[in-house]
C-alpha cells in the first residue's frame, strides 16, 4: 500500500443510496457562468439561477463530494437534489435560513 492510497471495494459504488431525490429545471438568466458545489444549500444559490427555490429548500446536488455543476449563461438544465443530512441546520451561504430547516 502506498501512503494515501485508497483501495475501493470491487464493483459499483452507489452514492447517496436510498435518499429521496427531486429533479428540478434550472436556468442561468445571468451573463456569467455560475458554479454550484456539491454541498451548497441549493435554495440559496446565485439569484441569477431561476428555479423553484421552495422545492430546493433543505437540499443539495446529488453529485460526488467535492465536485460542482456549472451553469453557463443562458443555459437550462435538469439537476437532481437530495436532502441535506445530519442536524439539518443551515448557516452562512446567503444567510436565508441561519438555523434549523
Curated annotation (Swiss-Prot):
E.C. designation(s): 3.5.1.5
Keywords: Cytoplasm, Hydrolase
One Gene Ontology biological process: urea catabolic process
The protein's annotated pathway: Nitrogen metabolism; urea degradation; CO(2) and NH(3) from urea (urease route): step 1/1
Cysteine disulfide partners in this protein: none
GO MF annotation, one: urease activity
Pfam families registered for this protein in UniProt: Urease_beta
InterPro entries, per the entry: Urease_beta-like, Urease_betasu_sf, Urease_subunit
UniProt-listed Gene3D superfamilies: Urease, beta subunit
Subcellular location per the Swiss-Prot or TrEMBL entry: Cytoplasm
GO cellular component: urease complex
CDD domains membership: Urease_beta
Catalysed reactions, semicolon-separated: urea + 2 H2O + H(+) = hydrogencarbonate + 2 NH4(+)
Similarity comment text for this entry: Belongs to the urease beta subunit family.
Subunit text: Heterotrimer of UreA (gamma), UreB (beta) and UreC (alpha) subunits. Three heterotrimers associate to form the active enzyme.
Name used for this protein in its record: Urease subunit beta
Organism annotation: Rhizobium meliloti (strain 1021)
Amino acid at each position: 500500500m502506498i501512503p494515501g492510497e485508497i483501495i475501493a471495494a470491487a464493483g459499483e459504488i452507489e452514492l447517496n443510496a436510498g435518499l429521496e431525490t427531486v429533479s428540478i429545471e434550472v436556468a442561468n438568466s445571468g451573463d456569467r457562468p455560475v458554479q454550484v458545489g456539491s454541498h451548497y444549500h441549493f435554495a440559496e444559490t446565485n439569484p441569477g439561477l431561476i428555479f423553484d427555490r421552495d422545492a430546493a429548500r433543505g437540499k443539495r446536488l446529488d453529485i460526488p463530494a467535492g465536485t460542482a455543476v456549472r451553469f453557463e449563461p443562458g443555459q437550462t438544465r435538469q439537476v437532481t437534489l437530495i436532502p441535506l443530512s445530519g442536524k439539518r441546520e443551515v448557516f452562512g451561504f446567503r444567510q436565508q435560513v441561519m438555523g434549523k430547516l
